[in-house]
Amino acid sequence: APCTYPGQQCKSDDECCHGTCKTAFIGRICMR
């Protein structure tokens, strides 16, 4: 499955291409 890039919404760390899934103002996004 394709991975989620930084700045895009995610549900868990393992979805992210880089870094981790963190809570932001717009919901949870992948961050380096």
From Swiss-Prot:
Belongs to the neurotoxin 17 (21C2) family. Keywords: Disulfide bond, Knottin, Secreted. Expressed by the venom gland. It is found in: Secreted. The presence of a 'disulfide through disulfide knot' structurally defines this protein as a knottin. GO terms for cellular component: extracellular region. InterPro entries: Toxin_29. Disulfide bonds join 3-17, 10-21, 16-30. The keyword Transmembrane does not apply. Transmembrane segments: none annotated. Its main location: secreted. Not toxic to mice by intracerebroventricular injection. This is U21-ctenitoxin-Co1a. The keyword Plastid does not apply. Pfam families: Toxin_29.
